[in-house]
Amino acid sequence: GGKEGLYNEVIDYTIAGTQKLIGGAEDTLRAGLDAAAGDRDALARATAAFVRAVLTALLGLGPEHWPRRLIMREIDTPTAAFDRLYQAIFQPLIDAFKQVVVIATDRDPDNPETTILTNALLGECLIFHRNRPIILRDLGWHEYTPDRIALVVDIVVEGILDALDLPAVKGEGARAK
C-alpha cells in the first residue's frame, strides 16, 4: 500500500491505456509484415499504416492527458517503474518497428546499427509527441487538430518510407485528397 502502491497502480493504468492505444498497431504491423512476404509495396503499406496509427494516436492525446506526462517524467527521471514501462510499452514498439527495418534494409537484427536506425526512425514519430509545445509554437499552431495531425503524419510517413528505401504509398492521407 501507501504512496508506492498507489504509484504502481497508476503505472498499471498507464500501461494498460497505452497498450490499448497503440498495441493494435503492433499486431497489425506484424500481420502485414507476414503477408508482405518480400513484396516491397506491401511492406511499405504495412509500415505506413503502422506509423500512421501510432502517430495519429499519440498526437490525438491533448496536453491535458496526464499519463503522457507521467511517461515523459519516467523517461527524464527513471524510477523503478521505468523498467515496467519499458518492457510493456517501449520494447514491444521497438521490436515491432525493428522488424520493418530488418526486412526493408536486410540488416542484422542484433547489430547495434540496426537498433540505432530503428530508434532514429521511431524518434521521427515520437518527437512530435515529446516536443509538442516546441513544435506547435514553431508552426504557429495552438494545438494539433485532426487536419494538422493528418499533415504531420503524411510527412513523417513519407520520410520514414524514404529512409528505408520503400516505395511511396499512394492515395492515403491528407495530401492525397
What function would you assign to each model-found segment?
Residues 9, 17-64, 114-121:
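Hydrophobic alpha-helical connector segments
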Residues 62-84, 132-138:
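Amphipathic alpha-helical segments used for helix-helix packing
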Residues 45, 79-105, 150-154, 158:
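Amphipathic alpha-helical packing segments from all-alpha helical-bundle domains
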Residues 141-151:
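A short acidic, glycine-rich active-site loop
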Residues 54, 68-75, 121, 125, ...:
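Short alpha-helical scaffolding segments that buttress acidic/His motifs in well-ordered protein cores
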Residues 7-14, 89:
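Alpha-helical DNA-contacting segments of helix-turn-helix folds
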Residues 64, 90-115, 138, 162-173:
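Hydrophobic alpha-helical bundle segments that form small-molecule/ligand-binding pockets
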Residues 2-7, 81:
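Short amphipathic alpha-helical segment with a characteristic S/N-K-E followed by hydrophobic residues
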